[in-house]
Each structure stands twice: as C-alpha cells, then as structure tokens.
C-alpha cells in the first residue's frame, strides 16, 4: 500500500492493530505516506502483529512473524465503501487462518466484484498454502482475478511436480498470475 501511495496512487488499508505503540507507529507511518487508514482497534490484550525479515545476498528471505491482532480479521472489519471505491482489492493470505477471516475474504471479494472491481490474493508462503490448499484453490477459482505467488507456492497450490504444470494450472484458474 505504501508503494502505491508513494507513487501517487490512492491506497487504503483494512485490518486490525491494537492500541499499543506498534499499532500507533504503523498507523502514523501509513498515513504519513498517504494511505487511508481506519483500522479496527479491538478491545483486549492481543498486541499488534510484527515481523522480522532476514534477506540473504542471494535474495532468499526468512521471516519470523507474529500476526497478533491482525489475525482476528472478521467480516465486520470490511469497510464496504472502501472496497467499492478501490480498483483492486489486495488480500493477504497470511490472514486466512481463522474461519472469520475466511468469511471476511469472501465478503470483501463479493463486494469488490459487485462493484466491478478486481480481486487479488497473495499466497504468502508455501506453508500457508499447505494449510489452506483446498480453500485457496476454491478462492482462486471463484473469486481471484490476480494471484501473487512464487515458484514454491504455486507448486504447493496445485500439487504438481513442475513449474510448467503449475503455470498451466494457474492460467486456467485466474486472469493474471504474478510470479
């Protein structure tokens, strides 16, 4: 979202942060670059999520992620006016673990499509795909116009042995895949 806003585009963030220092900094920094940010701030003690990313010189990444309160995304968090006003809805696969989050994804996608908008999904990592393969396949086939994934994520999604087979499968399922 910050990249889109930094290049002059309009961007909005739908999600959750806590009323803690990381949530405050996250919100401040998004707003500072022009991202519309009205997050859900749930009651309770679950802190704002965080992630440490290590990138090696050969461009491999290792991530240590705690999703925190962001994992509590639910349909009530989806601002329909924001989704309807956007051109592309971008959904983060890491948030797909809970049943309420799955409902939120489907709801947001339905709102986007009802307003003629495109829906995109990032597969996030192959372990995430392994956990949600059947649901992701259904989501990709039924709701997703643009799919973001890497080599390993696509192989996992389609349970095939070669990248060429994965590419052929994704071409059948969605309009555009960004690998």
What are these regions (language model features)?
Residues 1-16, 20-25, 32, 51:
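Glycine-rich phosphate/adenosyl-contacting loop at the front of the ribokinase-like
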Residues 44-46:
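Short, glycine-/polar-rich solvent-exposed loops and beta-turns at beta-strand/coil boundaries
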Residues 18, 24-42, 55-179:
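Ribokinase/PfkB-type carbohydrate-kinase core domain
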């Amino acid at each position: 979202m910050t990249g889109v806003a930094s290049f002059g585009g309009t961007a909005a963030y739908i999600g959750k942060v806590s009323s803690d220092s990381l949530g405050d900094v996250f919100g401040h920094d998004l707003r500072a670059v022009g991202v519309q940010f009205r997050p859900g701030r749930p009651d309770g003690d679950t802190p704002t999520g965080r992630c440490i990313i290590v990138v090696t010189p050969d461009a491999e990444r290792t991530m240590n992620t705690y999703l925190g309160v962001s994992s509590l995304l639910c349909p009530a968090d989806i601002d329909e006016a924001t989704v309807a006003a956007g051109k592309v809805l971008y959904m983060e696969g890491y948030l797909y673990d809970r049943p309420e989050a799955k409902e939120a994804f489907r709801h947001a996608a339905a709102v986007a499509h009802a307003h003629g908008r495109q829906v995109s999904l990032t597969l996030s990592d192959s372990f995430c795909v392994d956990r949600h393969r059947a649901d992701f396949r259904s989501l990709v086939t039924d709701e997703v116009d643009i799919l973001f994934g890497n080599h390993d994520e696509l192989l996992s999604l389609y349970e095939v042995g070669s990248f060429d087979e994965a590419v052929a499968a994704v071409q059948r399922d969605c309009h555009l895949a960004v690998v």
